[in-house]
């Protein structure tokens, strides 16, 4: 059973035995709270964490039904399971109170390394997703033909170095910001589209202008999924008012994240930034 849950019973005036969830105040190894709300739950059957709260509700209901089935013969009266999916049971309100008011933040950032389709995982990997392909040797004829057509050998080496650093995990330590500059139609977006396909689920899009605006307190919300890659297809660094936040992001410094309708929390982002621009960087 998940370690933050206890199955309890009580009798009603009509003699019905109610089976309901009781949530334990503790530092759980199966549940994470971030920003004063639900963040993730461990799903043993998948071997992954999930940030979908519905998965948590379904898992709790499964535990309730399992308990009811295993102990049905021990009850003399009829039983009623108070499910999370039933809004009239009031259990969903108890859950929200537990996550949002009674528990304190306790979390480990998820997805800080790539998980390929052939990568074994456990709870301590803190992974919530997988890429849909394995990491193994193979032919790269199409890639070689494309890159030799649109980029010089020197520029191609830089791009492949950046991609390789993400695959091997070194990008989390690099204090680099990749800017693809050139005229329209020179293949900048082509490369970024390939990067997105390579790291599906591990990238997010960002707005450099928002990061450089001192008045935008929610600029880091674009990074709330803790991406390993952040991409802007059409950026303009000339409009940056204050580069402090951008520099801290590139340097992987500890930053305060302000998400809408949630409490602030601190995080050290591990992403490598890519930007396409038609304007020279000064």
What are these regions (language model features)?
Residues 200, 243-265:
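Conserved catalytic/switch belt of AAA+ P-loop NTPases
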Residues 179, 230-231, 273-275:
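Structured core elements
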Residues 31-55, 107-228:
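P-loop NTPase catalytic core of nucleic-acid-dependent motor ATPases
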Residues 218-225, 258-276:
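AAA+/SF3 P-loop NTPase mechanochemical coupling elements
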Residues 1-126:
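Intein modules and their embedded homing endonuclease domains
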Residues 59, 63, 191-194, 241-249, ...:
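Alpha-helical scaffold elements adjacent to nucleotide-binding pockets in ATP/GTP-utilizing enzyme cores
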């Amino acid at each position: 059973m998940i370690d933050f849950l206890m199955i309890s019973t009580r009798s009603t005036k009509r003699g019905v035995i109610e089976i309901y969830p009781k949530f334990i105040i503790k530092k759980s190894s199966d549940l994470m709270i971030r920003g004063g709300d639900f963040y993730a739950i461990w799903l043993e059957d998948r071997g992954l964490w999930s940030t979908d709260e519905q998965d948590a509700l379904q898992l709790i209901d499964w535990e309730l039904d399992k308990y009811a089935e295993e102990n049905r013969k021990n009850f003399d009266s009829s039983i009623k399971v108070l499910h999370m999916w039933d809004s009239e049971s009031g259990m969903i309100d108890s859950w929200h109170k537990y996550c949002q008011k009674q528990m304190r933040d306790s979390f480990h950032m998820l997805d800080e390394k790539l998980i390929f389709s052939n990568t074994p995982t456990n709870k301590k990997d803190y992974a919530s997703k997988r890429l849909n392909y394995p990491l193994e040797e193979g032919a790269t004829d199409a890639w070689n033909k494309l890159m030799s057509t649109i980029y010089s050998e020197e520029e191609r080496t830089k791009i492949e170095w950046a991609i390789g650093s993400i695959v091997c995990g070194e990008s989390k330590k690099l204090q680099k910001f990749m800017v693809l500059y050139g005229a329209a139609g020179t293949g900048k977006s082509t490369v970024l589209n390939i990067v997105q396909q390579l790291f599906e689920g591990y990238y997010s899009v960002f707005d450099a202008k928002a990061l450089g605006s001192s008045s935008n307190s929610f600029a880091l919300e674009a990074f709330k999924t803790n991406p390993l890659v952040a991409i802007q297809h059409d950026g303009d660094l000339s409009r940056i008012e204050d580069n402090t936040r951008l520099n801290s992001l590139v340097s992987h410094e500890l930053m305060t994240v302000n998400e809408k309708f949630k409490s602030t929390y601190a995080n050290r982002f591990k992403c490598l930034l890519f930007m396409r621009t038609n304007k020279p960087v000064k």
